[in-house]
Every structure is written in structure tokens, then in C-alpha cells.
Amino acid sequence: MKKRLSLVFAALMALSMIAGCGASNSKDAAKDTSAAPATSAQTSADAAAGTVSTDGSTSMEKVIGALGESFMQNNKGVTFTYNPTGSGSGITAVSEGRCDIGLSSRSLKDEEKKSGLKETTLALDGIAIIVNPQNKVEDLDIETIGKISTGEIKNWKEVGGDDAEIVLIGREAGSGTRDGFESITKTEDKCKYGQELTSTGDVITTVSQNPNAIGYASLAAVKDNVKALSVGKVKPTEETVKDGSYVVQRPFVLVTKEGKALSDTAQKFFDYVTSADASQIISDAGAVPVK
């Protein structure tokens, strides 16, 4: 079941006005009722107040959540929301004007760009090939991963594991992670999935509970309850994703509408997350910043 994650932080500022007592002449009354000038802090808070709505990739949950939290802490009065619906749904949402910024864990397709959408790469993310911690297999190459995915290789003993049937766990159609995985392994529309799930978290949980399962998930989301395999003898890390030696990777993309201005608050958020100031937050969340 898709869940809705809403990160909401609001700072309410109390303003008081001092009304002067009545005076015997209009000159004194004017002095008593004159408004005090706004402080610089009040002006800054008012300028930042507003809402930023994002929608899309579940793989980007950790990264976008950390960025949204940081933005709200630095901009009192802002409401930030994130709806984890999947890359395809997020792209549709921004196209239809249902959110400010779409989130995709794949690049836009040519037809999506032609429809008036624009992509901005926020970060790079490895797609980890994950198995149950009990699995003896430690490394697979791309060709072997492809053969497992299409069902050409059906048993773990064929790749150095136990005598057990391989169960492929993947994402639903429209997922950016699935699109990236199938594109890299050249298995588009050929994968024999045992289960197709609607979120990165569901894939990780399912693999962690099945000793014969193999799946794929955002490296930023992988925890100790699953084992990430090396691919072609290269382990998935921030360094190997950044230098390109770990080949199973894809971009984290912000999607906006070409020619349509964002609200002041949404633009401020966009500028912040794509600046060098956000790099450490992105890195701490497990992705590789591009700045």
C-alpha cells in the first residue's frame, strides 16, 4: 500500500500592536497610532512562508526527506510535503499541475521532454543488487544478473549458491528503479518477477524475509537486513558510483514544467537543493551529489 509521507513544520509568529490612548488633538493621535516598522527577522519569515509540494520516486524518500527537513528548519513558516507515489506517477503529477516538483529516479523520456517537462539532476544513486544475508553468493556480473532476471538461470547453485530456486523481486511498471535496472541489464519487458512491489521499502523487506530472493533497490535505502552484492567485483559505494566503476546506477531527477515559473517558495527550495549547500545532506542520505 502506498503511504503518504508529509513533513510539516510551521512557525507561528505572534505580533502585538500598541494602541495609543485618546489624545486631545489629532497630532497626538497620529503619533500614538503609527505602526512600528517590521523587523528584518519578520520580513525574512514572511518572505519564506508558503508551501512546497513534491511527488514521485520512493527511492528518493531518504534524500528528499532530509532536504525538506533542512529547508523547513532554515525557513520558518514553510510547509514541505512529499508524496511517495513512484517516478511515473510523480512525472504525471507535475505535468498535470498537482505538485510543484516531480521526483524521478530515471531520466525523462524523449516524449516526456517533448510534452513540456524539464529535468534537473539532483544526485546519482547506485541500484544495489540485494539478496538475503543467508545467501552465500557475494558477486555477480551484469550478464549473469540479466540471465537470472529473465529466468535463463533458475537455481542458486548455478552461480555458486545453495540448491534452491531463485525468486526475483522487483518493482511495479512505471518505477524509475525498475526502468533503470532493466535498461542496464538489457532485460526490458523480459524479467520473470516472482513479485512486483510498489515501493523500495517493500522490496527490501521481502528480500530480507526470503532466503532465496534477489532484488534491486536504491543504494541510499539499503540497510543491514539485506546484503548488497558486488557487481563485476565492484562493491556499490558512494565512491564507486561517483567514479562510474559501479555500473548499476541512475540519476535522481527533479522534474518541472518548461516555461512555467515556480512559486517563490518552491523556487527557493529548488535553488537550495541544487546548490553546493545541500551536497553534504545528499551525501549523508546515501546518494552522490552532483555539486
What is the role of each PLM region?
Residues M1-L7:
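Positively charged n-region of N-terminal signal peptides that target proteins for export
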Residues R4, G22-G88, T92-K291:
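Exported/periplasmic ABC-transporter solute-binding proteins
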Residues S16-G20:
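C-terminal motif of bacterial Sec signal peptides marking the signal peptidase cleavage site
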